[in-house]
Amino acid sequence: GFLADTCRQWEQSTVPVEALGIRRCVMRFAPVLGKKADGTPGGFLERMLPPFRMFVGGPLGSGKQPFCWTHLEDVTGAAALLLQRPDLAGTFNICAPRTPSMSEFTRALGKACGRPSWLPVPAPILRLMLGQMADELLLAGQNPVPARLQAAGYAFSQPDVDSALRSLLIHGG
């Protein structure tokens, strides 16, 4: 699809630096959960919250698809590890070590903001709104594993979706 092709081309565009003897670390990011500078939820989480706050949140599509994610603390932690370890190079998946289903993720989101997760958004509605991107970003789901980060000894600060969402929403979210 478009997204996979774009990522592949983007990553390939960095290959020539290796011929110059420059270490190349490619970070593949899952949707990042974090806060903005003012302490309010930002990024993907900011987009997911409004329906939940209006008591109409729920899974996207069937809810069975995997929903990979990562916490901003782990994005910065992984980047710091790669900067500090000249022996590491190549491609790294920046995602939580366990990927929940979309239903599990939205249940955790509802719980963290004290709202139900009961109203699914049907796939045809998402496709009508987002076209091909609905399938690529939200409906097909991916289940990457941060194996290379873990092998390098990285310890995730937010490995669990429930505690990660609570950390972002209980205090100031």
Regions found by a protein language model. Give the residues of each.
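Glycine-rich "substrate-gating" loop/helix at the edge of Rossmann-like oxidoreductase active sites
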Residues: 1-3, 30-41, 62-70
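Residue-level signal for the nucleotide or nucleotide-sugar donor/cofactor binding architecture
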Residues: 5, 67-73, 100, 144, ...
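Glycine/proline-rich active-site loop of Rossmann-fold NAD(P)-dependent oxidoreductases
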Residues: 8, 33-47, 82-92
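Conserved beta-loop-beta element that borders a ligand/cofactor-binding pocket
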Residues: 12-35
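Alpha-helical membrane-targeting segments
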Residues: 38, 47-69, 111-141
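Alpha-helical substrate-binding/gating segment
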Residues: 49-58, 64-99
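Mid/C-terminal beta-alpha module of Rossmann-like enzyme folds, strongest
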Residues: 78, 82-132, 166-173
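C-terminal amphipathic/interface module of NAD(P)-dependent oxidoreductases
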Residues: 136-173
